[in-house]
Amino acid sequence: MNHLLSMEHLSTDQIYKLIQKASQFKSGERQLPNFEGKYVANLFFENSTRTKCSFEMAELKLGLKTISFETSTSSVSKGESLYDTCKTLESIGCDLLVIRHPFNNYYEKLANINIPIANAGDGSGQHPTQSLLDLMTIYEEYGYFEGLNVLICGDIKNSRVARSNYHSLKALGANVMFNSPNAWIDDSLEAPYVNIDDVIETVDIVMLLRIQHERHGLAEETRFAADDYHQKHGLNEVRYNKLQEHAIVMHPAPVNRGVEIQSDLVEASKSRIFKQMENGVYLRMAVIDELLK
């Protein structure tokens, strides 16, 4: 694996291999590789807590040294292009670049970069490591994907998580459904849009998404009402209690409590939200190992 850019670029065999390797790192079954003498730069052009810190933790566990990079104090603020920034880091000896960028498909401009790139999110395009850690969490729970009913609720149109998980879950044989306000429907993703109350008793996984306020126009934001959204599309106690006994609740976070999900359900027994974060470290360790070996 030369780069990790999109879930659409991964075969199902590669997905299972990454999940297995991550699980072995988590259990201690797999010995940690020694990447002492390897250097990584994390380039985050959008804000991040979980993804950035998770990658940093994964890098530390694998023995990598991290090159400090802050967009606000770099030459990006002087107008330097993404390509020139990445080429500079390659030239000074970085072995791996982890990049989050607000532009969809930013990596298409980096074809002449000769070190591995891990996409940590591109605009509303793809978020492959989030999808992989979600798949790991689901596989831990069920041990399979074929036939699972997955309901993805939220801002489908603007969510890179929705797009990545749609492609990967479909490829693995799961049944994907969406629930979203009409304004956030994405017709390019061929899955049915359903009323949450019509399917809540039959789904195996409810995957809630954050509202992507930063990608909305002024008119769209003016129309948005958190209480109305929560009533029509959020997971409240009534809906939670209708879930099957084995069903689980997921969210890539950050969570807007009281909007996508009732606050006291974030750590309820069916919630795997913080388990996803835990798994993210081991999954990203597996990705880094594949990219650098």
From Swiss-Prot:
Its EC number is 2.1.3.2. The keyword Signal does not apply. InterPro entries: Asp/Orn_carbamoyltranf_P-bd, Asp/Orn_carbamoylTrfase, Asp/Orn_carbamoylTrfase_sf, Asp_carbamoyltransf, Asp_carbamoyltransf_Asp/Orn-bd. It is an enzyme of class 2 (transferase). GO terms for biological process: 'de novo' pyrimidine nucleobase biosynthetic process; 'de novo' UMP biosynthetic process; amino acid metabolic process. Pfam families: OTCace (PF00185), OTCace_N (PF02729). One of its GO terms (cellular component) is cytosol. It catalyses: carbamoyl phosphate + L-aspartate = N-carbamoyl-L-aspartate + phosphate + H(+). GO terms for molecular function: amino acid binding; aspartate carbamoyltransferase activity. Signal peptide: none annotated. PROSITE patterns: CARBAMOYLTRANSFERASE. The keyword Metal-binding does not apply. Carbamoyl phosphate binds at R50, T51, R100, H127, Q130, A253, P254. L-aspartate binds at K78, R160, R210. Keywords: Pyrimidine biosynthesis, Transferase. Pathway: Pyrimidine metabolism; UMP biosynthesis via de novo pathway; (S)-dihydroorotate from bicarbonate: step 2/3. Belongs to the aspartate/ornithine carbamoyltransferase superfamily. ATCase family. Catalyzes the condensation of carbamoyl phosphate and aspartate to form carbamoyl aspartate and inorganic phosphate, the committed step in the de novo pyrimidine nucleotide biosynthesis pathway. Heterododecamer (2C3:3R2) of six catalytic PyrB chains organized as two trimers (C3), and six regulatory PyrI chains organized as three dimers (R2). This is Aspartate carbamoyltransferase catalytic subunit. It comes from Staphylococcus aureus (strain JH9). The lineage of its organism: Bacteria, Bacillati, Bacillota, Bacilli, Bacillales.
